Structures are given as structure tokens and as C-alpha cells.
Regions:
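N-terminal assembly/interaction segments in proteins that build large macromolecular machines
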Residues: 2-200
């Protein structure tokens, strides 16, 4: 078993935001391999985030993003369980990153799939079925279903990879949220947003 140094624990904490004991355990389980420990903590923190999902979120922050050309702006509300986390730098940075993403992607209309009204889904499904009318009958429904899934990814926030792919390693907003939730030990919820664009 590899000797775990305080410097390794600090580096892992800085990279993941996990607690000291979690970092020590992850390093011990991976024989001091930092990269493997990061992966292990992501898995564990993700599981922890799932367990936090049912807790009430009565605190949070509203953050704004105004594009440098002053033609697009976004307000976003991100909620959590305590005012302590609402003031946390990582939490506030996440809310700002979400606002920036929404500003960059004009197709977003809803936070998640659950918010898309059934009548809107039905209307889109009918359009996709008509577009596939010339295909064999046995594949029409699958084509329409695939197009609906792709459309939902375009119009809902949480399933989209963040526009800053380099910083977030191509992760979706939901994956980033789940990691943050696990890191902070609280439920983190993107509640709502408003996007404003000149001339839109």
C-alpha cells in the first residue's frame, strides 16, 4: 500500500472539493493515484448527490450574465438547502456558469424534460412522424422518437453539455450540478431562468 502524503490529500481536495477523509480514503483505495482517486470521488460524490435530491431547497442565489455586446442577458435562480452554501464561491460560480450557458444557447426554453408541456411534446412528435412518413412503417415511430429526444436536448438546459467544454470536460449541466451537490453535501437545483435578447 502506497504512503499517502498531506500534499496528495491537499491536491485531491483542491481538484474535487471533497472532504479530507473522503480524499484520504480515495487515495488509499487507489494506491495514491491522483487521477484514479478523482474518478473514484466523482462516482461517490455523484451517488451522494442522488441521495440529496429529495431535500427541500429554500435558500439559493439569483445570478445574472450580460454578454459583452450588451445584447443578451440572463437571470438564473439556483437553489440549495442552507444560506451557508448559497454564499459558497463554487455554488455562485455554478449559477453564473449556467447563466452564461443559457445566454450562449438561444434554443433553451425549459430547465428540464419534466417542464416541457405534454401538448408541446405531442405537437413535435406529430411533426416528426410526418417527416418520417416516407419511411417504412416499422421504423417511423423510432425515427420520430429519436428526433423528439434530440429536440428535447436542444430545448432543455440540464441535458446539454456546457458551452465551455474545455473547462467542464464536455459534461452536461446536470452532471456538473450533481458533482457540485455531492461536493457541497446539499441538494442543488436550477429552479428557473429568464433570457433576454435585443430584438427577440
Amino acid at each position: 500500500m502506497a504512503q499517502i502524503s498531506a500534499a496528495q490529500v491537499k491536491e485531491l481536495r483542491d481538484r474535487t472539493g471533497a472532504g479530507m477523509m473522503d480524499c484520504k480514503k480515495a487515495l488509499a483505495e487507489t494506491d495514491g493515484d491522483i487521477e484514479k482517486a478523482v474518478e473514484l470521488l466523482r462516482v461517490k460524490l455523484g451517488d451522494k448527490a442522488l441521495k440529496l435530491g429529495g431535500r427541500e431547497t429554500s435558500e439559493g442565489t439569483v445570478q445574472a450574465y450580460i454578454h459583452s455586446n450588451a445584447k443578451v442577458g440572463v437571470l438564473v435562480e439556483v437553489d440549495c438547502n442552507t444560506d451557508f452554501v448559497a454564499r459558497n464561491d463554487d455554488f455562485v460560480a455554478f449559477a453564473r456558469a449556467v447563466a452564461m450557458h443559457i445566454a450562449a444557447v438561444p434554443t433553451i426554453k425549459w430547465v428540464s424534460d419534466d417542464e416541457v408541456p405534454q401538448e408541446v411534446r405531442d405537437a413535435e412528435t406529430r411533426v416528426f412522424e410526418q417527416q418520417a412518413a416516407d419511411k417504412p412503417e416499422q421504423v417511423r415511430a423510432k425515427i420520430a422518437e429519436g428526433k423528439l429526444r434530440k429536440w428535447l436536448e436542444e430545448v432543455t438546459l440540464m441535458n446539454q453539455p456546457h458551452v465551455n467544454a474545455d473547462r467542464y470536460d464536455g459534461k452536461t449541466i446536470e452532471q456538473i450540478r450533481a458533482e457540485l451537490s455531492g461536493q457541497l453535501g446539499e441538494n442543488v437545483v436550477v429552479r428557473r431562468f429568464a433570457r433576454f435578447a435585443v430584438g427577440a
